[in-house]
C-alpha cells in the first residue's frame, strides 16, 4: 500500500536492524484517515472470504482492526494481555511471546465473543516472528472457529513470521512488507502501486 509505505518512510523511525517505531501514526498516536484507507485495503482483499468477526491483540492492532470491522460490517474483539477482574469465567487463552517487549503474556478472550463456526480475520499492526499471530490462531481454534486469514499492516519480511504462517496453511495479506531495516531506513520487498 503506497500511502502506508510513504508514511513509514516519512514518519517511521528505524531504531535498529530489527525495530521500526511507527507510534506517530499507528500504535500510539493514530492517523484515522490512514486507518480508514488500511481498512479499505483489507476489506478489498478479504471481501469474498466470508468474514464474520475480526480478532486482534491489544493494543497496536485495535485501530486497524476496528476500522476493518466497520468496513466489513462485522464485530471486532481484541485479546487482552492482562486478565481483569471482569474477565474471570468462560475464557480461552494462549501464551504469546512479544519480540518488542521481550516477554511472554497470556492472551485472553471471553468465549462469548469468539464462537464456533465463525470465520475470523486476524488483524495486527506488525508481523515479525509470528508469535502473536499463532497465539491468536490458537484462540480461534480453541473456540471451534476458523481462521480466514491474517491482515498485517507492516510485515518484517526479514523475520520468519510470514513463512511460518504460510507453512501452516494460512492466508497472509500484508500492506507493507519490509525487506530490511538499515542505516535509518526501511527498504520494502516490492514497490507497490496501490
From Swiss-Prot:
InterPro entries: PRibTrfase_dom, PRTase-like, Pur/Pyrimidine_PRTase, Xanthine_PRibTrfase. It comes from the Bacteria. 5-phospho-alpha-D-ribose 1-diphosphate binds at residues 128-132. GO terms for biological process: purine ribonucleoside salvage; xanthine metabolic process; XMP salvage. It catalyses: XMP + diphosphate = xanthine + 5-phospho-alpha-D-ribose 1-diphosphate. It is found in: Cytoplasm. Coiled coil: none annotated. CDD domains: PRTases_typeI (cd06223). The keyword Amino-acid biosynthesis does not apply. GO terms for cellular component: cytoplasm. Pathway: Purine metabolism; XMP biosynthesis via salvage pathway; XMP from xanthine: step 1/1. Its EC number is 2.4.2.22. GO terms for molecular function: xanthine phosphoribosyltransferase activity. Xanthine binds at residues 20, 27, 156. Homodimer. Belongs to the purine/pyrimidine phosphoribosyltransferase family. Xpt subfamily. PANTHER family: HYPOXANTHINE/GUANINE PHOSPHORIBOSYLTRANSFERASE, XANTHINE PHOSPHORIBOSYLTRANSFERASE. Converts the preformed base xanthine, a product of nucleic acid breakdown, to xanthosine 5'-monophosphate (XMP), so it can be reused for RNA or DNA synthesis. This is Xanthine phosphoribosyltransferase. It comes from Exiguobacterium sibiricum (strain DSM 17290 / CCUG 55495 / CIP 109462 / JCM 13490 / 255-15).
Amino acid at each position: 500500500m503506497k500511502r502506508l509505505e510513504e508514511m513509514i518512510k516519512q514518519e517511521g523511525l528505524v531504531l535498529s536492524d530489527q525495530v521500526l517505531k511507527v507510534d506517530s501514526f499507528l500504535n500510539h498516536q493514530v492517523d484515522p484517515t490512514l486507518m480508514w484507507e488500511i481498512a479499505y485495503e483489507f476489506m478489498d482483499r478479504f471481501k469474498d472470504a466470508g468474514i464474520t468477526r475480526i480478532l486482534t491483540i491489544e493494543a497496536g492492532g485495535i485501530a486497524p482492526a476496528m476500522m476493518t470491522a466497520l468496513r466489513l460490517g462485522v464485530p471486532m474483539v481484541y485479546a487482552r494481555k492482562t486478565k481483569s477482574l471482569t474477565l474471570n469465567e468462560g475464557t480461552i487463552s494462549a501464551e504469546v511471546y512479544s519480540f518488542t517487549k521481550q516477554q511472554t503474556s497470556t492472551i485472553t478472550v471471553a468465549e462469548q465473543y469468539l464462537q464456533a463456526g465463525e470465520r475470523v480475520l486476524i488483524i495486527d499492526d506488525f508481523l515479525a516472528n509470528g508469535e502473536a499471530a499463532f497465539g491468536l490462531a490458537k484462540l480461534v481454534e480453541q473456540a471451534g472457529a476458523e481462521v480466514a486469514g491474517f491482515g498485517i499492516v507492516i510485515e518484517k519480511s526479514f523475520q520468519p513470521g510470514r513463512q511460518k504462517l504460510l507453512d501452516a496453511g494460512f492466508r497472509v495479506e500484508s500492506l507493507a512488507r519490509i525487506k530490511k531495516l538499515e542505516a535509518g531506513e526501511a527498504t520494502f520487498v516490492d514497490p507497490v502501486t496501490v
